[in-house]
Regions:
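Flexible, polar/low-complexity N-terminal or interdomain linker segments that lie immediately upstream
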Residues: 2-65
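Active-site neighborhoods of enzymes that stabilize oxyanions during catalysis
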Residues: 139-142
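Structured helix-beta-strand junction loops
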Residues: 50-51, 93-94, 137
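Second-shell loop/turn segments in exported
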Residues: 29-34, 76, 102-104, 121
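N-terminal, post-signal-peptide region of Sec/Tat-exported proteins
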Residues: 49-87
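Catalytic cysteine-centered active loop of the rhodanese-like fold, especially the PTP/DSP P-loop
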Residues: 85-134
Length: 142
C-alpha cells in the first residue's frame, strides 16, 4: 500500500511540476517575432530619437501610470480601439513602428508586432523588454 501511495504522490508531483513549467513558459514572450527586428532599450531610445512611432498595447491603467512620450496607445484587448483599421491608420507601411508593452511577461507587444508584419508594415521593431526597461534606463516618460 505504501508503494502505491508513494508512486501516486510522485506522479502527482511530476504532473504538477510539468503543468507549472508549461504555464510559466507560455507566459513568457518570445525572444523574436518573424518579420520584426528585436531591439533593446538603447536601440529603442535611438529609434524614438529618430522619430519612430511607438505603439503601446498595454492596459489603459498601465498607460495612464506612465508611457513613452508621444507613444500611441491601442489597448490590444479592446476591439473598439485595437483593430486592423486602427493599425493601418498609424503610419505608412515603410515608417518605423516600435511595439512595446510590460516586458518579457507581456505577450501583447509580440502579438502586436506580428499583426503589423501581417498587415505589410516593413519596419517593425519588437521592444520585448518594453516599458520597464525604458523606465529603468532613466529615459523620458509621460
Amino acid at each position: 500500500m505504501k508503494t502505491v501511495l508513494k508512486s501516486t504522490l510522485q506522479t502527482a508531483l511530476v504532473a504538477s511540476a510539468l503543468t507549472f513549467a508549461t504555464w510559466a513558459q507560455a507566459a513568457t514572450s518570445p525572444l523574436t517575432v518573424p518579420g520584426a527586428t528585436t531591439v533593446n532599450a538603447a536601440e529603442a531610445k535611438q529609434l524614438w530619437e529618430d522619430g519612430a512611432i511607438f505603439l503601446d498595447s498595454r492596459k489603459t491603467a498601465d498607460w495612464e501610470a506612465g508611457h513613452i512620450p508621444e507613444a500611441v496607445h491601442l489597448d490590444r484587448k479592446n476591439p473598439d480601439v485595437y483593430n486592423s483599421d486602427a493599425l493601418n491608420d498609424l503610419a505608412a507601411k515603410d515608417e518605423a513602428i516600435v511595439s512595446y508593452c510590460n516586458g518579457e511577461r507581456c505577450l501583447r507587444s509580440a502579438k502586436t508586432a506580428e499583426d503589423l508584419v501581417k498587415l505589410g508594415f516593413k519596419k517593425v521593431y519588437y521592444f520585448r523588454d518594453g516599458f520597464p526597461a525604458w523606465n529603468d534606463a532613466g529615459f523620458p516618460i509621460e
